[in-house]
Amino acid sequence: MFESKKALVFCPKFFSYDVEIKKAIENQGYDVELHDERPSTNIFIRALIRLGYNDILKKKIESYYLKIFNTLTEPVDFLIIISPECITPEILKKFREKCSNIVVYMWDSFKNKPQALDLISCSDAFYTFDSNDAELYDIKLKPL
């Protein structure tokens, strides 16, 4: 019997872009599970993340992602991460056990989210909206 394709998406909640992205992927024939890329919407935690203090939140971040990982009962065709701030290479490697393709898209510059550079080597495809970042880091340009 035909099985639908599955996508797991981590995207910041931002002016409902996450919901629109989910709809667009569903329109491509995927069952989509959507999660916020950040483990909390608490303003203090979001500020720590934005300022790059992820080490302080390491246990919270790992716990958040592992909880989601442990709920996956079937293989996932695509893990899509949009504008990552929290997810680490170690977490991506864990998800690789259940996700056959890992795709990352940056809608922000690496100047603002330098930790995302560590994800390039862990991804099957890595895209950016920033032409300077695309050239500097030899990644694919995909404007907004």
List each model region and its residues.
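Short beta-strand->alpha-helix junction loop in the catalytic core
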Residues: 143-144
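Short helix-terminating capping/connector loops at secondary-structure junctions
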Residues: 2-3, 74
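Extended catalytic core of nucleotide-activated donor transferases of GT-like folds
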Residues: 10, 19-21, 28, 33-138
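Nucleotide-activated donor-dependent transferases that construct or modify glycoconjugates
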Residues: 3-13
